[in-house]
Amino acid sequence: MKLSLSPPPYADAPVVVLISGLGGSGSYWLPQLAVLEQEYQVICYDQRGTGNNPDTLEEDYSIAQMAAELHQALVAAGIERYAVVGHALGALVGMQLALDYPASLTVLVSVNGWLRINAHTRRCFQVREQLLHSGGAQAWVEAQPLFLYPADWMAARAPRLEAEDALALAHFQGKNNLLRRLNALKRADFSRHTDRIRCPVQIICASDDLLVPSACSSELHAALPDSQKMVMRYGGHACNVTDPETFNALLLNGLASLLHHREAACKELL
């Protein structure tokens, strides 16, 4: 699997891996790259079955497979320890990495994530699946911004959204791959495993997220033994895109704090 690695800003700089959501595209994190690359070696990628990592996914494709594929690609690239910033589905992959490769994951940042799919989120995806079946890729793509962005933000950026729609259609991952990735997301349930997630976790959510209620992040925070939660008042599901200034400040401060916390804890064990 192809990865995009930025040069480390200094020797032994911490590694931060960015994992996008259901769309799978590494370009989702463009508003974060410049600031992160000043402090970290940053890795982003198109998830298997999407973008520049095309493939036909198995019918029973799972979050565990997504985590294993990424970890194997990182090891092949010489990356043994890394922090993860995951958005929605990407946060689920991050939690799976924390369970399956605890020695490798230093810090996890969950952005609009959850323990198990919420009834409201499931309803949203049912509607979107119906659109996909009845109207194809174009209907899916045209409806997607409604679940990602605040209404006023969209209204002020109509030309941008039209361009994004055209790009998304041109690089659509395919109906079967999309549904298999979506089914993996819907089956994931970490509610009985949080006591095994030992790395420090930063939870960022947006109170106006239409797709994933912020209560999901509250449940995640309550269940994780070593977590802190930050709430953005505005931004929607894609809050890192709509309000990158606020998001980036939270992310940079959180990463610095948690990585320092992890390093101090490791020194105490020596």
Curated annotation (Swiss-Prot):
Its EC number is 3.5.1.-. GO terms for biological process: nitrogen utilization; uracil catabolic process. It holds the Pfam family Abhydrolase_1. Keywords: Hydrolase. It is an enzyme of class 3 (hydrolase). It catalyses: carbamate + 2 H(+) = NH4(+) + CO2. Signal peptide: none annotated. Involved in pyrimidine catabolism. May facilitate the hydrolysis of carbamate, a reaction that can also occur spontaneously. Belongs to the AB hydrolase superfamily. Hydrolase RutD family. HAMAP family: RutD. NCBIfam families: RutD (TIGR03611). This is Putative carbamate hydrolase RutD.
